[in-house]
């Protein structure tokens, strides 16, 4: 960390102190910035990020009343389970503002640059789900649907009118612009598409006759009924697909670099598969809206307190990669009649995915995030697992003892939480014991922390640092001055 970067952090913390933490000595922030700077210089950013994450985890376990005594890293912890490096800040834990301040300091790890190679083993490793739990849950699907008054969707009809503009990326380039190329390269998926939408082969054969494979793209005008993209003189024709770009690829994996050196794997599908999946995607999101415990649309983190029960903030490891596709397929089969579920499975995982390194990988347990319907299907199946645990505990399906957002879940019922852990373990989905928090007073949901019903989430430094650095970059490059000169010149006021 350079001297200039340290100065930026101090500048930012002075402002944050003025707005939120006027009663906290600014020297405490300066001390922490110096410590982090020394760690970066001596050990690098990746080590520093991992170290701060562990400190944060030990700290949150402390305020949960579930202190860590030992961790898999060289880290000083006192007899109370508090990180020794934070000793000067320990008194601040007696107030809500103090806890929030410490979490603010610990969010500095999200500002540090760093990347890691993605781990594909969670994708390729065969499922560890037991046959017994799969049979139990598959048999429970009709009961789950009855408890939540879920009616089958019936037949999902897809026609040419359901084609849409997409701003997403496809395996060959921008999705809509490369739809014509996808149409030829993904022909091996026609049997699967037919199981999901019987008229797809007829429609595509008609389109293939109208649009030659290597001609200028007429997809927007012939299929969508829209005007073709306008091209300025001197620019490359954006509607032309060059022969060298037409690789035999219909599935790719893209890596998104998230904060704290995380590598998130996102699957990229061809335009036609996405278009056919989109109708199921919309129906599943309508279904998710009916679950009072679901937070997809609100991200509302509040959960009613149940006396005598603890909050269980459960951290799932690679949930979507490991949660059995077989169970999700059976759920889809109960929602949609005919061979739709078989086609859905073939479209999602029947074709290998090409990684950025050029390797080919296959999903052997769960399913890829990135396709329409994939996330929503997992979310509904996740609700079903919790409801199965609740059913075993004799609870009503509309009880508000948990909140859920995809793979993020907080359960405020000890019996349900214990059963849930056992079920997920039997399904081959790991729950991190170190990152999971169990407390009568505190819980974490969607990266937000609550203590005695009050939010203590730290101020996220990364967003402010990005704005601050962007502003300084523009100023140093005199970008604003250049733009102002252009504007005044055009207006005749130069």
Predicted regions and their residues:
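Acidic/polar loop patches that form or flank catalytic/metal-binding clefts of enzymes
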Residues: 290-293, 431-435, 457-458
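Acidic, glycine-enriched catalytic cores built around paired aspartates
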Residues: 2-6, 49, 96-98, 124, ...
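Non-catalytic, polymerase-adjacent accessory regions of viral genome-replication enzymes
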Residues: 1-255
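Surface-exposed, low-hydrophobicity interaction/linker segments
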Residues: 210-211, 216, 221-232, 278, ...
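Short helix/loop capping segments that flank catalytic or ligand/cofactor-binding pockets
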Residues: 264, 276-277, 321-324, 419-420, ...
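Active-site-proximal segment of RNA-dependent polymerases
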Residues: 258-318, 374, 387
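Conserved polymerase palm-domain catalytic core
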Residues: 307-405, 410-427, 434-450, 467-494
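Reverse-transcriptase-like RNA-dependent polymerase core
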Residues: 239-261, 342-359
């Amino acid at each position: 960390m350079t001297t200039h970067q340290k100065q930026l952090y101090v500048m930012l913390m002075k402002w944050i102190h003025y707005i939120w933490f006027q009663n906290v000595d600014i020297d405490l922030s300066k001390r922490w910035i110096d410590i982090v700077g020394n760690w970066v210089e001596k050990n690098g950013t990746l080590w520093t990020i991992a170290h701060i994450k562990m400190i944060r985890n030990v700290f949150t376990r402390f305020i949960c009343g579930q202190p860590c005594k030992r961790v898999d890293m060289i880290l000083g912890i006192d007899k109370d389970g508090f990180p020794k490096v934070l000793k000067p800040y320990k008194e601040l834990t007696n107030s809500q503002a103090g806890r929030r301040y410490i979490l603010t300091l610990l969010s500095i790890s999200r500002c540090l640059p760093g990347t890691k190679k993605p781990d594909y083993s969670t994708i390729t490793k065969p499922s560890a789900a037991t046959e017994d739990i799969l049979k139990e849950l598959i048999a429970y699907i009709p009961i789950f649907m009855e408890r939540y008054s879920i009616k089958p969707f019936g037949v999902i009809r897809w026609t040419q009118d359901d084609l849409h503009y997409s701003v997403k990326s496809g395996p060959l380039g921008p999705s809509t612009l490369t739809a014509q190329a996808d149409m030829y390269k993904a022909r091996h998926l026609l049997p699967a598409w037919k199981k999901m939408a019987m008229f797809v082969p007829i429609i595509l054969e008609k389109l293939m006759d109208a649009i030659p494979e290597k001609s200028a793209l007429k997809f927007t005008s012939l299929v969508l009924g829209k005007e073709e993209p306008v091209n300025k003189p001197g620019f490359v024709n954006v509607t032309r697909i060059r022969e060298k770009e037409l690789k035999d690829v219909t599935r790719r994996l893209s890596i998104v670099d998230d904060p704290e050196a995380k590598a998130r794997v996102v699957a990229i599908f061809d335009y036609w598969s996405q278009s056919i999946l989109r109708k199921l995607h919309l129906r599943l999101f309508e279904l998710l809206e009916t679950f009072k415990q679901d937070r997809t649309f609100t991200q509302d983190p509040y959960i009613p307190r149940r006396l005598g029960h603890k909050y269980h903030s459960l951290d799932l490891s690679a949930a979507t990669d490991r949660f059995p596709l077989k169970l999700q397929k059976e759920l889809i089969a109960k929602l949609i009649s005919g061979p739709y579920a078989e086609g859905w499975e073939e479209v999602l995982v029947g074709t290998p995915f090409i990684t950025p390194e050029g390797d080919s990988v296959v999903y052997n347990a769960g399913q890829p995030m990135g396709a329409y319907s994939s996330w929503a299907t997992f979310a509904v199946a996740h609700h079903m697992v919790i409801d199965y645990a609740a059913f075993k505990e004799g609870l009503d399906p509309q009880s508000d003892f948990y909140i859920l957002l995809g793979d993020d879940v907080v359960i405020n019922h000890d019996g349900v939480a214990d059963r849930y852990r056992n079920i997920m373990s039997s399904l081959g989905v790991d729950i991190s014991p170190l990152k999971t928090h169990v407390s009568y007073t505190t819980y974490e949901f969607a990266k937000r922390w609550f203590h005695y019903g009050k939010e203590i989430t730290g101020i996220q430094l990364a967003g402010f640092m990005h704005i601050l650095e962007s502003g300084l970059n523009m100023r140093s490059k005199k970008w604003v001055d250049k733009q102002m000169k252009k504007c005044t010149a055009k207006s005749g006021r130069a």
